[in-house]
């Protein structure tokens, strides 16, 4: 049962916290933590990160006048406590559900979410944009970016920090170090020093000292500068950030409410240069099962609040992710040139399994997709067989490198694109909807999509065998169909699809895991007296043009089905048919794609039904192409 929350019950907006004492803020933080745990136990989601920033969230909304003052959360999966405090408590148990709250910050959801998030390292750049707009308008509000140490492995964060000093003198960056990867706080002395260097008296003395130093002879002046930097770096660890033009404060204990409130008040009106506050937090703080878990319960399904035991579904067939990893391990056992690269997602992509088998051939480059792609290009250029395992949505971050460093040079980098299609609870920011279009546009690219886990095994083998150009294969989140996978699947013939069912009236050409729904749609058509051919294209590029032309000759209509946006597989098929004159004889065609909107989170099956990509939707597409507006198909040729 949820603990009593007397203070939280009085909060309708962050303004209600601004008269609270520090003691009351501590109690409020405890209540927000309990509320967060209770909510996520019902919805599932990202738990550990949010628990780690409860005190910081309360302190930020207490010290700053949000939403006038802008707070931008990097990634956003730590923002559940923020949502509880900003008028969304009554809907917090709809997190990541259909029609409910997003699992990330979202502009359309609240004025307290000034900038949407989900991909890493965007916060400082966005904050600088807000700062420049504020300065241009002559306004005086604060702008705060909260970024984790994990996101600081992404180059975009440093690009923004490098530009900060030339953009504005008034920006606050809070570095949420929840992995103790930069520097731990050193007890009470650390908190004292952080408060000291953020205070006005220290800054005045330091400014006076700099003025005096500037009047000294050059050799003495340079020595004095270096000594000051060295001494300050020894005490605070902030020399690197100072070199970027920031005033560094920290590290401080991110769970010490007294220190947080004091330091944030000190830096609130700092306008000499951008300031970075280094806050050290503990992921999963305040919930024993999270504190004791290896991953700090970063992402969870529904769980029991008392024990922390997650209510995981009964084990089913292996996931597509696991099948990919297992197949790659098989090939690596007989081919020592195979290398695997991930951008901070080893468990999400299955490369944690590959890494256990072949640690010396596994590279986690951090949140650095651009580097991952060009690093793989370098490996390929020197004879290795690199596999970049990456979520489709994150490959977007490295697309220029795919074009410039891989495709133009025709280097045999293999892209394993996980989370293709719709992903459910994580919504539009994590959906893999565009890769067919942007990868299929590249000359020389071999682009495949697996219909099931056996096909995925064949595609891994195919990618291993392709050594004269780049290749990519896509597969969805979730479990396979439970099919038996060969010991070592054979490579596919490049650019050749397969006919799964022969028919006469309409040809349904599927790419990817919609094949099962296409077969169901064929059954529905058969029940209406219509005979359907079902084909698995396998390749979006190069297309099996011979198969497509044959289907065009022998059928009244062709329906293409894909788990992607317009401009992908269906567009490629239309282009091929038009080029070969197959549309000149009255062929009827429909391309079934995801709708031209960013679909909000829901269960994947419901999302595909909304998109018209389930069996009923495919049936409707086929009947429309055939000019049938009712359920009767009497008289149609069978």
From Swiss-Prot:
Disulfide-bonded cysteines: none
Protein name, UniProt field: 1-deoxy-D-xylulose-5-phosphate synthase
Cofactor note: Binds 1 Mg(2+) ion per subunit.
Cofactor requirement: Mg(2+); thiamine diphosphate
Pathway noted in the entry: Metabolic intermediate biosynthesis; 1-deoxy-D-xylulose 5-phosphate biosynthesis; 1-deoxy-D-xylulose 5-phosphate from D-glyceraldehyde 3-phosphate and pyruvate: step 1/1
GO MF annotation list: 1-deoxy-D-xylulose-5-phosphate synthase activity; magnesium ion binding; thiamine pyrophosphate binding
Residues that hold thiamine diphosphate according to the record: 77, 118-120, 150-151, 178, 287, 369
The keyword Ubl conjugation appears for this protein: no
Similarity-based family: Belongs to the transketolase family. DXPS subfamily.
Lineage top rank: taxon: Bacteria
Functional summary from the UniProt entry: Catalyzes the acyloin condensation reaction between C atoms 2 and 3 of pyruvate and glyceraldehyde 3-phosphate to yield 1-deoxy-D-xylulose-5-phosphate (DXP).
Any one GO BP annotation for this protein: thiamine biosynthetic process
EC number of this enzyme: 2.2.1.7
Taxonomic source organism: Caulobacter sp. (strain K31)
Subunit organization: Homodimer.
Keywords: Isoprene biosynthesis, Magnesium, Metal-binding, Thiamine biosynthesis, Thiamine pyrophosphate, Transferase
Reactions listed under catalytic activity: D-glyceraldehyde 3-phosphate + pyruvate + H(+) = 1-deoxy-D-xylulose 5-phosphate + CO2
Residue sites binding Mg(2+) per the record: 149, 178
Keyword Electron transport included in the entry's annotation: no
Pfam families in alphabetical order: DXP_synthase_N (PF13292), Transket_pyr (PF02779), Transketolase_C (PF02780)
